[in-house]
From Swiss-Prot:
Ranges of biased composition (kind: Basic and acidic residues): 121-140, 176-193
Subcellular location, principal: nucleus
Domain of life: Eukaryota
Modification after translation (UniProt): Phosphorylated in oocytes during prophase I of meiosis.
Biased segments, Low complexity type: 1-19, 27-43, 194-229
Name recorded for this polypeptide: Histone H1
Gene that specifies this protein: His1
Region Disordered: start-end pairs: 1-53, 108-256
Functional description taken from the UniProt entry: Histones H1 are necessary for the condensation of nucleosome chains into higher-order structures.
Length: 256
């Protein structure tokens, strides 16, 4: 009995630690939610004071410069924030910007005068000009890279072409040698054929030349009697004339 009583008395003592742990977890959850809410509230819904002041001066476009009141009014109207709470930050920025050269103070002293943007600040504030400059630089860089790549590729192609040309020359030379060999073989064959063919006409020519002298000799023999016949005629004429002349001599002798 005493043991059961001790067990029952011990059980209620062990229960409180679980409830304590639950409370601690709830507190941590509530604490994390509170910190998240604080962080959400701490993040501003407007850009920093530097950007707001520069934008207000740029968009107001006042010849004599924009005053502190005009800047505050512009900030409250466009960004919908309390410019009175931001006034110390605005004044601090105006003073530092005048010292740095981002702003030019046309009137007054400190943060109570009128302010204009400097030429360097105007150039910095033009996003279009920045983008144009960046795009131009990128184009120049891309052109340089492209020209380098083209130069490398042209060198590679030139080397490849130089490597290919000797091979082509070798192939052409081998083709030419093969063709020359073929032509030489064909010429040799033709020479053999022509030798065989030419020998036959030579033999025929020899026969013709051998036959021609006989004809010439025959012609000469035929012509010789004609030549020999002519002198005979002349001799006869001479004899006739002699015989004719002889009686005349006789007559002259008779006259004596």
């Amino acid at each position: 009995m005493s043991d059961s009583a001790v067990a029952t008395s011990a059980s209620p003592v062990a229960a409180p630690p679980a409830t304590v742990e639950k409370k601690v977890v709830q507190k941590k959850a509530s604490g994390s939610a509170g910190t998240k809410a604080k962080k959400a509230s701490a993040t501003p819904s407007h850009p920093p004071t530097q950007q707001m002041v520069d934008a207000s001066i740029k968009n107001l476009k006042e010849r004599g410069g924009s005053s502190l009141l005009a800047i505050k009014k512009y900030i409250t109207a466009t960004y919908k924030c309390d410019a009175q709470k931001l006034a110390p930050f605005i004044k601090k920025y105006l003073k530092s910007a005048v010292v740095n050269g981002k702003l030019i103070q046309t009137k007054g002293k400190g943060a109570s005068g009128s302010f204009k943007l400097s030429a360097s600040a105007k150039k910095e504030k033009d996003p279009k000009a920045k983008s144009k400059v960046l795009s131009a630089e990128k184009k120049v860089q891309s052109k340089k890279v492209a020209s380098k790549k083209i130069g490398v590729s042209s060198k590679k192609t030139a080397v490849g072409a130089a490597d290919k040309k000797p091979k082509a020359k070798k192939a052409v030379a081998t083709k030419k040698t093969a063709e020359n060999k073929k032509t030489e073989k064909a010429k040799a064959k033709d020479a053999k054929k022509t030798g065989i063919i030419k020998s036959k006409p030579a033999a025929t020519k020899a026969k013709v030349t051998a036959a021609k002298p006989k004809a010439v000799v025959a012609k000469a023999s035929k012509a010789k009697p004609a030549v020999s016949a002519k002198p005979k005629k002349t001799v006869k004429k001479a004899s006739v004339s002699a015989t004719a002349k002889k009686p005349k001599a006789k007559t002259t002798a008779a006259k004596k």
